[in-house]
Amino acid sequence: MKTRKSHPIKRFFEQETAGGILLIVAAALAMLLANSPFYGHYDLLIDTPFIISLGDFALEKPLLLWTNDGLMAVFFLLVGLELKRELLEGELSDPRKIALPAVGAIGGMLVPALIYWWINKDNPLALSGWAIPAATDIAFALGVLALLGSRVPVTVKIFLTSIAVFDDIGAILIIAFFYTSKISMLALVVAAICCAILFICNRSGVTTLRAYLLIGLVMWVALLKSGVHATLGGVILAFFIPMTAARPHPEIKIPSPLKFLEHELHAPVAFLILPIFAFANSGIRFIGMGVEDFTHSVPVGIASGLFFGKQLGVFLFCGVCVLFGWLKLPKGMRWVHLYGVAVLCGIGFTMSLFIGSLAFQESGINSVIDERLGIVFGSLVSAVLGFVVLRSAKQKA
């Protein structure tokens, strides 16, 4: 039984880490193109308009926004499915196991946001980016852990993943409450009706995924038109997908609709959606930039929040709880592992880029460049230091 249980965990980390490495490659390729003679073609590609029409109804957006509003809704659907499964029967179903990563995640969101606020408190326009350094990119972080192989205990990977899950919950709440534009009540009513239908389907024992996905698509369009960020539709839909299916006979085993959909989405999200997102959002053109671009309060605040704030928040909040005897480190984890994980939490990348696109969507191009500079620098330094710390942990063991 023990061997069977280890397979899904092993498959999860193999897929997440491989996706993280592909994410790094996609981001590097975008930066390479943006700083090459082909940068015009890159800009033209991400700004290419795509239209979806049905009768009088039409949606027209550039590729960049289709990626951020559409593909990322599928990513958040997967995040929601993982959250529901973890809360019902996974690591997050045991309060004793979730307390320490939950505390770490809270510290890892509060301290970076405070550092960013302190650096940008005199710049009202920049303050809208306070949540950018509060995010953690689990795929990127696990990609770094993959480079360490067996040097890192599995408990360390599970602990990092648990922190990232709570981080995702925080990011979802932040997007819902702080990055919502003007509300269209009619579209919001349509979205609410979709939620009601999804609830009825769930309570009535409907297990056909097509029904949920079709209603979810209508809800996504309604949210897109309502002013509430459409990616939240993915999370809402996920929590209505049934965990179990009714058995026509006790001996007949019916697969879980939620687990089936989660399994089907993992590969497309890891190997297609997130790399496309990274490619579309990472094309920073360094040519022509001056010192003032790198020392602007926005990139400095983001980089400081990710690098200093994340490690300080996660390590300090967890450390205090362990030292006072309120909580315990997971079995097989040492203080150096906790610090290494805290540093890796500073890899914000895709989630930070996404929140940044919402925070500065009304601003000019300079704000966008400033935001991405800080994210890339803070994430890169966190990745390098986290790798060094965890690699040295094995040598000292």
Swiss-Prot record:
Pfam families, alphabetized: Na_H_antiport_1
Keywords: Antiport, Cell inner membrane, Cell membrane, Ion transport, Membrane, Sodium, Sodium transport, Transmembrane, Transmembrane helix, Transport
Molecular function (Gene Ontology), one example: sodium:proton antiporter activity
Segments traversing the membrane: 18-38, 63-83, 98-118, 129-149, 158-178, 181-201, 207-224, 269-289, 306-326, 340-360, 373-393
Signal peptide, first to last residue: none
Cellular localization per UniProt: Cell inner membrane
Membrane topology: Multi-pass membrane protein
Organism superkingdom: Bacteria
GO biological process: regulation of pH
Key word Cell membrane present: yes
UniProt GO cellular component terms: plasma membrane
Reaction(s) the record says it catalyses: Na(+)(in) + 2 H(+)(out) = Na(+)(out) + 2 H(+)(in)
InterPro entries, alphabetized: Na/H_antiporter_dom_sf (IPR023171), NhaA (IPR004670)
UniProt keyword Transmembrane present: yes
Assigned protein family: Belongs to the NhaA Na(+)/H(+) (TC 2.A.33) antiporter family.
Function: Na(+)/H(+) antiporter that extrudes sodium in exchange for external protons.
NCBIfam families, sorted: NhaA (TIGR00773), PRK09560.1 (NF007111), PRK09561.1 (NF007112)
Designated name of the protein: Na(+)/H(+) antiporter NhaA 3
Gene encoding the protein: nhaA3
